[in-house]
Regions:
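Generic beta-strand/beta-sheet core signal
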Residues: 6-9, 15-19, 38-41, 65-70, ...
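FabD-like malonyl-/acyl-CoA
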Residues: 12-24, 52, 56
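RNA-binding accessory domains that recognize and position tRNA/RNA substrates
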Residues: 1-5, 23-33
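A conserved beta-strand->alpha-helix junction
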Residues: 30, 34-88, 96, 122
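Active-site adenylate/phosphate-handling loop in enzymes that bind or generate adenylated species
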Residues: 25, 60, 84-134
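Alpha-helical scaffold segments in soluble metabolic enzymes
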Residues: 20, 52, 75, 102-106
Length: 134
């Protein structure tokens, strides 16, 4: 696979991440379409941030993937007994962790490298996908 995967929410952190990735792709003489911008709407996604993410990916020439994580997060809440009405740290971080999981799975199947600027988790993940050896 010859791609870079970036989670794109339409917010500041992911905007900077895809802009940096775009510059890196140009420096490596790679086509913009080798950037896979993954937007993962859920409960807190606004129309504005969703539209910002889509427009930015299109303007940069990235390949855009939309993966709705709402059903997965709702199932997780059901599993752990989290109320949809309780907008606490668990509510927010469950969405962030699901996005990280989705991005890592997309990256390991499609990318040479990936970047998950997930500020809700308090640390960024970056690096090449890993593979297990037997």
């Amino acid at each position: 696979a010859q791609a870079a995967v970036v989670g794109l929410s339409g917010g500041l952190d992911s905007t900077l991440a895809i802009l940096i990735t775009s510059v890196a792709m140009r420096l490596m003489d790679r086509p913009a379409s080798d950037m896979i911008a993954v937007t993962m709407p859920c409960f807190g996604t606004t129309e504005r941030t969703r539209d910002n993410a889509v427009e930015l990916a299109e303007r940069l020439g990235a390949t855009l993937r939309r993966i709705d994580i709402g059903a997965a997060v709702r199932q997780h809440f059901k599993d752990i007994g989290q109320s949809m009405d309780d907008h606490d740290v668990t509510f927010e971080n469950s969405q962030a962790r699901e996005r990280t999981q989705v991005l890592m799975d997309v990256a390991t199947s499609a990318a040479d490298w990936w970047w998950v600027p997930e500020t809700s988790l308090s640390w960024p993940w970056a690096g090449p996908p890993t593979t297990a050896t037997t």
